[in-house]
A protein has these predicted regions:
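Glycine- and acidic-residue-biased ligand/ion/polar-headgroup-sensing regions
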Residues: 103-116
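Conserved short histidine dyad/triad with adjacent acidic residue
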Residues: 66-73, 86-101
Length: 205
């Protein structure tokens, strides 16, 4: 027993020290964050972007490795044991439409303002969240959120578990209808980056 304890103390419980330069790679500065690249595409009407995303989706932490996702491509920090973090900034009344994550949990914490979170295929489940309230939505459940305050609101969004890629996110079928009404071809823009529009309990497996 003493030998095992000594081994653990000498090998597994050691600390490391890193430089300021190394730690800077683990710091995200809010003022330096920019919306996802597709949110800056001038060919996509703002109305269409608002159907799919928060007005500004700011990537804070991306996955380790070379995962090619919008969050990874713009995050200042990479690698946090499989967790990703974004900040969803929404003007009053705005928020993304119903969508499901097939494998991952999505956890929302209100950092500023008041939000309504809805869930299920018809959005029939509903709860209001105030500052610092948190809700964690499990995989395969349709969910949406909307700023119900009078000022700009901010949600912290954590994605954990499962595989974090575009195949994990599936929009509700009515999102495709909304996009087609806004502008011909805009749905295909989102589909080209991997979004699908089949999130419904009646969808084919």
């Amino acid at each position: 027993q003493p030998t095992i304890v000594r081994f653990l103390m000498e090998n597994l419980m050691k600390t490391i020290e890193i430089t300021l330069g190394d730690m800077e790679k683990r710091i995200s500065r809010f003022r330096a964050l920019k919306p996802l690249p597709i949110q800056q595409d001038p060919e996509i009407p703002q109305e269409a972007k608002d159907v799919v995303y928060a007005r500004k989706l700011l990537s804070v932490i991306g996955l380790e490795g070379d995962a090619n996702t919008p969050i990874n491509n713009s995050s200042p920090i990479t690698g946090a044991a499989g967790m990703t973090m974004t900040l969803a900034v929404c003007p009053p009344g705005q928020g993304p439409s119903l969508h499901a994550h097939q494998q991952t949990y999505e956890t929302f914490t209100v950092l500023r303002g008041r939000f309504e979170v809805t869930w299920n295929d018809d959005g029939g489940g509903s709860v209001e969240l105030n500052e610092f309230d948190t809700i964690s939505v499990p995989p395969k459940v349709n969910r949406a959120f909307r700023n119900i305050g009078d000022d700009e609101g901010v949600l912290q969004v954590l994605i954990t578990g499962g595989v974090h890629d575009m195949a994990d996110i599936d929009m509700s079928p009515d999102v495709a209808v909304k996009l087609d009404r806004i502008k011909t071809g805009v749905k295909q823009k989102f589909a080209a980056m991997g979004l699908t529009f089949n999130a419904h309990k009646g969808a084919a497996a």
